[in-house]
């Protein structure tokens, strides 16, 4: 595959809500609306239609557009009703989405619980990606922790919350500088041999970390932020993924809703919205970056 086709293919994996979809994110100036009135298929089969494309991600068959389930637990401000979010997840499935992204730290735990409940009726028809790597069980959700014993406990917890006997795609959420990557990869390899994990990947990892991990246990995917306004993965990450045949899953492909047109220079975010802390979303930056 040449570089142009690789970039085109890679960029089509869009975890929409992982960086704030227009349907879930909240801004003062222009708050989009969404409908949750879709009817679920009686056959528990997604509506493939003519609009959804499907891809190979390592050995996984996934929809080209996935649903990231971080904003549902208020990461971008606001509080959302469990019933509505389960309906949203199932509506995405009705529209052909078969790839869902979550993590133990989202909530913490809440996102996995909602995803597990929402997808239970058609679990065998979807692929779920989740993540380990933060000190959630120690009540330190911002502390990085990828010790082997912690990984095992995190996976057992995720399996329970997701109501499943296996995780389709398990990511290390962030690289732990205190734990050798070889130890992390070796632990996940053991979990794969036990059938609890089918594929694994890294999130926001350097090229060096990717190489070290892949040497011990081949990676299926790497997840990083990637959008028109953030193309850093093109420099070192994409060439390595192409070399090793590893898939790429971008998060925030819509620039945390900035690229959707629902945000303008007058937008101000709700209290609790994490975008307040990002330099791209200061009033000065919004004004400067408007087309």
Task: Indicate where each model-derived feature is located.
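Alpha-helix N-cap and loop-to-helix initiation/capping positions
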Residues: 80-84, 110, 114, 142-150, ...
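Active-site groove signature of glycoside hydrolases
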Residues: 160-177
């Amino acid at each position: 595959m040449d570089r142009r086709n690789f970039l085109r293919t890679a960029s089509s994996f869009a975890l929409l809500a992982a960086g704030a979809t227009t349907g879930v994110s909240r801004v003062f100036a222009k708050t989009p609306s969404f409908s949750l009135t879709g009817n679920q298929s009686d056959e528990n089969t997604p509506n493939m239609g003519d609009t959804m494309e499907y891809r190979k991600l390592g050995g996984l068959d996934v929809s080209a557009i996935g649903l990231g389930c971080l904003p549902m637990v208020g990461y971008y401000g606001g509080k959302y009703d469990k019933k509505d979010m389960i309906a949203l997840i199932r509506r995405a499935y009705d529209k052909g989405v078969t790839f869902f992204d979550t993590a133990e730290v989202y909530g913490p735990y809440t996102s996995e619980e909602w995803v597990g409940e929402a997808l239970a009726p058609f679990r065998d028809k979807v692929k779920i990606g989740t993540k380990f790597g933060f000190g959630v069980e120690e009540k330190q959700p911002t502390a990085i922790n990828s010790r082997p014993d912690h990984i095992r406990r995190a996976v057992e917890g995720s399996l329970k919350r997701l109501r499943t006997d296996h995780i389709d795609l398990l990511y290390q959420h962030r690289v732990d500088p205190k734990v050798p990557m070889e130890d992390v990869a070796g632990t996940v390899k053991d979990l794969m041999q036990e059938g609890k994990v089918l594929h694994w990947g890294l999130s926001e990892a350097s090229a060096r970390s990717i190489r070290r991990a892949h040497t011990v246990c081949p990676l299926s995917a790497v997840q990083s932020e990637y959008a028109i306004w953030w193309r850093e993965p093109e420099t070192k990450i994409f060439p390595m993924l192409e070399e090793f045949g590893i898939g790429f899953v971008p998060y925030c492909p819509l620039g945390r809703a900035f690229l959707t047109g629902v945000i303008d220079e007058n937008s101000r975010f709700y209290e609790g919205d994490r975008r307040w802390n990002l330099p791209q979303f200061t009033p000065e930056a919004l004004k400067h970056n408007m087309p």
